[in-house]
Amino acid sequence: MYRSSPFDLGSNITDFDAIRISLASPEKIRSWSHGEVTKPETINYRTFKPERDGLFCARIFGPVTDWECLCGKYKRMKHRGVICDKCGVEVTLSKVRRERLGHIELASPCSHVWFFKGLPSRIGHILDISLRDLESVLYFEAYVVVEPGDAPVKEREVIKDETKFRELDQQYRPTGFKALMGAEAIKELLKRVDAESLSVELREKMKNETSIQKRLKFAKRLKVAEAFRKSTNKPQWMILDVIPVIPPELRPLVPLDGGRFATSDLNDLYRRVINRNNRLKKLMDLHAPEVIVRNEKRMLQEAVDALFDNGRRGRVLRGANNRPLKSLSDTLKGKQGRFRQNLLGKRVDYSGRSVIVVGPELKLHQCGLPKKMALELFKPFIYHRLEQTGHCTTIKQAKELVEQQEPVVWDILEEVIKDHPVLLNRAPTLHRLGIQAFEPVLVEGKAIKIHPLVCTAFNADFDGDQMAVHIPLSPEAQIEASVLMLASHNILSPASGQPITVPTQDMVLGMYYLTKARPGSKGEGRAFANIEEVLLAKEMGEVETLTPIRLRYTGDVMDLTTAYDDQDVTHTEPVPFQRQYINTTVGRAILNDNLRRATAEMPYINGLLKKKGIGNLVNYVYLRFGLEITVQMLDQIKSLGFQYATRSGLSIGIDDMVISPNKAKVVKEAEQTVNSVQQQYLDGAITNGERYNKVVEIWSAITEKVADEMFGNMQQMDKAGEINPIYVMADSGARGSKQQIRQLSGMRGLMAKPSGEIIETPITANFREGLTVLEYFISTHGARKGLADTALKTADSGYLTRRLVDVAQDVIISEYDCGTVDGIYVSSIVESGEIIEPLRDRVIGRVSLEKIKDYEGNVVVDVNQEVTEDLANGIAAAGIERVKIRSVLTCESKRGVCALCYGRNLASGRLVELGEAVGVIAAQSIGEPGTQLTMRTFHIGGTASRVSEQSRLDAKNNGTARFHNLTVVRAKEGHLVVMNRNGAITVIDEKGREKERYAVVYGAKLRVEDGQQVKLGQVMVEWDPYTFAILTEIGGAVGFKDLHEGLTLHEEVDEVTGLSRHVVMDSPDEKRQPAIVIKGAKGTKRYLMPSRAHLMVLDGEEVFPGDVLAKIPRETTKTKDITGGLPRVVELFEARKPRETAVISEIDGTVKFGEVSKGQRKIYVVADDGTEREYSVPRGVHVNVQEGERIQAGEQLMDGPLNPHDILAVLGEKQLQSYLVNEIQEVYRLQGVNISDKHIETIVRQMMRWVKVEDVGDTNFLLEQQVDKFRFRAENEAAIASGGRPATGRPLMLGITKASLSTDSFISAASFQETTRVLTEASINGAVDHLRGLKENVIVGRLIPAGTGMEYYRNVALSPELEAQAQQVQEEVHQAYEEAERALELLRNEGEDETGNEELVAE
């Protein structure tokens, strides 16, 4: 495909639809080649010219300098295409040395290491020879039978014994016996393979085979046979006769100073091959002894292996400084490989980088660009404009003007950058808002100025961060930048739909100060007729900014001071006022005066605005007034915030850290409580573990109490009108948190040991008082761990993002409606009775699947209608519990997803458009906070924050208590005790609607009866969170079974207290099953005792229903690491099986216990129809179910995490999908990160696209093959249509890494991971990549098929009038391009034209 003429460069090679990869036949390799390389020499040591027929030969690969042959006989362009008769070099461009290949003819065939050694061995599979035997044949250690003749051996049998071979050879050679060794033998065998008949034969064998082991083996072989059958590849091409030599410029030899050369490793590897090949040729010509020739052939084979993949087999070849040589495979692999370094990540021109500083005077769509940078970046535009305006006539003159920085140049620069957006990017670019477009404003100095409000999106601060600038060149690029990427168009986060350009830090502080009321200020309580009077009084000094006043007002007023949530601007209804008085402050009047400049319809906002309130205000304005007004208002708030933060003069000093006066008293009380707990322990009432837990609990509570008191004090001072800057900063949300202030002026609290346990003696001091040496020492560990973790987790999170992007990159909105009839149900998320996320928030921006009706039967939302904010409020008002919506999980689009299943594009607030790359957006939205999760430790400095255990449930509403599925017994004290695990208690209002629902734990004490009226705050349930109790359901006498001292029981004597208690232990004899049997009037009942249970009763004792028989202490709590559950997220996305998973029941039924064998206890679940399932649970693990209890499918039989694959098998796809989405959301929710469900659903959809074939039927699938769902369905439909039997399969969930590697596109998979494996597989299959995803297109250098590059938007026809205009524009553009081309050509020829180009005047 090479082209020697430079004038053919215009012809386009991007005009193709697909790329195929396959094995190259020897003929193909020879046809690529421009000549055979026969000498190992590179360049001549004296002349530095390439040696003839060597690795850099100019005759084969092309001239070293443009338009010049090697000997210098032909120079200049006029001899184009001539082949020099003296040196044989063609006169052409030297860059053909980047594209011309050579070849090496091997004296003896060699195997290709990928196909022989890559697992599974393709050569081995197709010949049915084991890898070890194959290796011994290829490396001349054994013979393989090619022709058995009459000998008692089979074809392909491997003979390892030399003497045996000799005997057979002597005896049977006349009858045609032939055995060979080396690649020749294998090649001979491969030639005879007929893929077609092999395929048929294997399918027959599979049908008749009963052993699963053998069937799987046949399936593996069949896979390789099918690959050859379907592709044009021939098996013998896996053995090489000819090796291609890649172009010399791609394996350069660079002169260093000092006369030495740096060379690419490939040259060394090629030299080895050539040397050994030449030596082998000589030996063969000399008819050398077989042994020597064989040895040489083996060495040649090893050299070829090393060239293709160094270190795959045998020793790694090392270079001069003991560094392994980089082979061809290594050039492709890894982050530094061809794919990731050069194809996916290219460096671009017209870019620069510099330090950033804040530019508070900028508008949201502007950035400050240093003049020096702008001058360099916009050079071509300046040259062109200088020529146009007649300031100069040639490019050369323009260049001189710019270099001398003439005054006219600056004016031209101003003109050029007007309306020419630039892109700013801050690394790491974690989501799409890491690159935004701005209109440049020229600034002095060398720093880029950026608007303070975009810092959140870029995650930028001004402690030395740098940013890169890129210039969009083509008109299309400029339009896209200003329409799609302008900072003022990107104020919503694509992850959650919340505003992301929200004021932070100083601005929040200023706004808080401005809207604060300070009693006792000058002029308090004065009444004003309108805002203008207030401003006048302020100017005259009659009132202060914080003075509370009364203002007469006409218009809408949003009074946050009376609202339930005083920051909830979005949901507070404005009330119309008619010349009525508002109690407000001067500052709030100033704020509203400013806000009304953006729009006159703005309601008067009366309230103290904190960070959350300002965020909600931005959201409110965006929803009500749209983008333009929001942007104006943001700039108003920015200016006001900075202005008043400055005017307030807030600063902090040590006296602002107010220590609560009765801190000492509280701490003393705590010490007394701890001592009493210690005493209980000494008396033997509690175990050591319980003591520890209680002590930790006490100190946690005290730390909170001290902090609350301190905060309360600050609040009192604040109300009294004394401003405490530290309190103001934390309360406003500008900087610092309650936790940090607690450490400054409360107490530092509990710290963690390096092992992660909590040290039970807390640091009672704070930073203001100062720490003792011991306290300081205890603190250091936490602080250091924080720093170390941050560094490690950032890398993990980045890798997670990479995998997510890879698995979802080709999910694009491909059609408007896929016509599915399936959807998912959503309802509010409730955790321990609290509504964490109301239904209203979950359905906004989704599309309803069916009519949503209220209880009267009125339609609230229609079919396929997008649920807007108003409709969602309607749903909430109607009290609807759950709705069915469309989701990407149930979308039927074969490629990508459809707009209706996806719903709203969160970044724009409208229904998603065709071509939107929602997969990448989803991946970024999940990955970006991953880095945030990981960087979180940092600030709290390792203080142990334990989630204090909940031990009771209080009613949150008035209503009626109802029990659901609760089994209870009445204890002797008269209260009810819960005896099962899957029950719940709810509170119902007078209309019968469920207001709250709580799952109730086993062993909990109920403080209410079924149907009892409860009041708000009433205790309903209590339990002990630190131990797990086993209770009796019946009264009677205790009898021990298999509980013998020393065998299954041991007495633990506490060293401190001297008291003993019995603890159950594992017995070496498996027949013994420790249990307590209660014999009562109502019969007998047996309770199995797990190991580590502490017995609370004695043999023969009398017990009553609900009494505790044994306690199992819970593990002592360790502090939650800041992995922020990052490992948990990875575990879920990778579909890993967690360690020690819980066994779940596959059927509904009744529990029956079996015997223990081999360390496993058998549990049977018997269904109503008598079928039973058997489960094995490790002995000594606490079993969650009682004998005779009824359980449902999917219920856990023991404690532990669930295995997602089990959920899929037992409960099906929908259950698993909702499990994954909720589990992942939970991790993020704990961190306070808001991500829309649809992003997680998008990734989960990609994980669950697969089916594993269990029975092939009459289709072309293979057993155990994993297939795309849609392809599976299509093949089955085809099979049924032709009267065959369809295949059956089971749904399969793949982790994101596996799913990425299973994609149709081999280019995408190879650039992700395991490059060699992917390419080996693809080339055998003759795989065709249709370039449908994003990555493949980036790699081959085309526009990505998403966004404006989507097919749908290409080839759009225009009306005739527009057509004419477009034609004209096109001609003008074409003309401009031609001028530029001419100018470039002149610049190129400047150096070599003798005439000089001063006289050449371009028009």
UniProtKB/Swiss-Prot annotation:
Binds 1 Mg(2+) ion per subunit. The keyword Transferase applies. Its EC number is 2.7.7.6. InterPro entries: DNA-dir_RpoC_beta_prime (IPR045867), DNA-dir_RpoC_beta_prime_bact (IPR012754), RNA_pol_asu (IPR000722), RNA_pol_N (IPR006592), RNA_pol_Rpb1_1 (IPR007080), RNA_pol_Rpb1_3 (IPR007066), RNA_pol_Rpb1_3_sf (IPR042102), RNA_pol_Rpb1_4 (IPR007083). SMART domains: RPOLA_N. Residues 1391-1403 have a biased composition (Acidic residues). Zn(2+) 1 binds at residues 69, 71, 84, 87. It catalyses: RNA(n) + a ribonucleoside 5'-triphosphate = RNA(n+1) + diphosphate. Keywords: DNA-directed RNA polymerase, Magnesium, Metal-binding, Nucleotidyltransferase, Transcription, Transferase, Zinc. GO terms for biological process: DNA-templated transcription. Disulfide bonds: none annotated. Zn(2+) 2 binds at residues 818, 891, 898, 901. Pfam families: RNA_pol_Rpb1_1, RNA_pol_Rpb1_2, RNA_pol_Rpb1_3, RNA_pol_Rpb1_4, RNA_pol_Rpb1_5. Mg(2+) binds at residues 461, 463, 465. GO terms for molecular function: DNA binding; DNA-directed RNA polymerase activity; magnesium ion binding; zinc ion binding. One of its GO terms (cellular component) is DNA-directed RNA polymerase complex. Residues 1384-1403 are annotated as: Disordered. The keyword Repeat does not apply. Its cofactor is Mg(2+); Zn(2+). The RNAP catalytic core consists of 2 alpha, 1 beta, 1 beta' and 1 omega subunit. When a sigma factor is associated with the core the holoenzyme is formed, which can initiate transcription. Belongs to the RNA polymerase beta' chain family. PANTHER family: DNA-DIRECTED RNA POLYMERASE, DNA-DIRECTED RNA POLYMERASE SUBUNIT BETA. DNA-dependent RNA polymerase catalyzes the transcription of DNA into RNA using the four ribonucleoside triphosphates as substrates. This is DNA-directed RNA polymerase subunit beta'. It comes from Koribacter versatilis (strain Ellin345).
